[in-house]
Amino acid sequence: LALTEFGPQNIIYNDGGKFRVSRMMLTGEVTPNKFFYNPKTGVIYKNQENASHHTDIITGESLDGVSKMIPGYCIQLQDMVAQESEKITCQEEERSRKFYQLKTYFSSDDTRAISMCELKTNNGTHLANIRYIPSCRLTYILESKNDDNANGFAFDTKTGDWISAERMAIHMQKQQQHPEEPNSIKYVKLFTETTANAIYIQPLDTLALSDKGAVRTFLYAFKQAIEDVFQIEGSEIGADVMGDEKVPNLLIYENAEGSLGVLERLVLEPASYHAVVKRA
């Protein structure tokens, strides 16, 4: 929520006033992070030069030749500063978040704790594999939809200012006139991490989910069934489509502070599992 609500140049409202997110508070030197991920599953590794030597925690396959690096200058989200402004136009309000795209990845520090069950019909047809991942580490990366500059946001690494397009044009002109001066502005992506219990669902061909729309429909139905069976609010459970668009998988995780424990029950308690499947 913080990544999108308090994203670069975003407009927020408080006590009837309009505020623009203008700066990120820096506590030290800005340090970039390297992320490698498996596009088939969404499993991610941070700051590991030899990520290709790892195996995927879902498929067990080697990441050699499979993993991809997330391009750009990735920095961790810190506290933001917003300035009140009365000159924000309706067009600016509508445009600000349209340029955001939030991507979700995951990993686990204890793969031995991952357990699996199978989603089956009453007659035993195998529909999907479900893995329960306790203390799953979720990584959210905020990018710009603008394909230029590695989908990053213009950021002054010395002051923490988010640089508007107008200021960037002036800055580039000055850089051309004085190339000897150091350039503190970089195009960055923001990330944040959290830990939550999660389940990872791999649909099989027998489910006949032929496109991403069908996958999202299945994801919504399964998530809604969990909410209904365990009587929890929709905001307490998050869900994302993960991995390859041709063979997408599903990640469902607990959003509430502290563990709800419902996803663990789903995998470990047959009665809870059957109730959710029947409801879905």
Predicted regions and their residues:
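Residues immediately within or flanking Cys/His clusters that coordinate Zn2+
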Residues: 3-6, 32-35, 42, 50-53
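Extended, highly charged accessory segments
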Residues: 1-16, 22-25, 52-280
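Short solvent-exposed strand/turn elements
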Residues: 39-42, 80
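Long, charged amphipathic helices and adjacent flexible linkers at domain junctions
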Residues: 24-30, 35-37
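Zinc-coordinating Cys/His ligand positions in small cysteine/histidine-rich zinc-finger domains
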Residues: 46
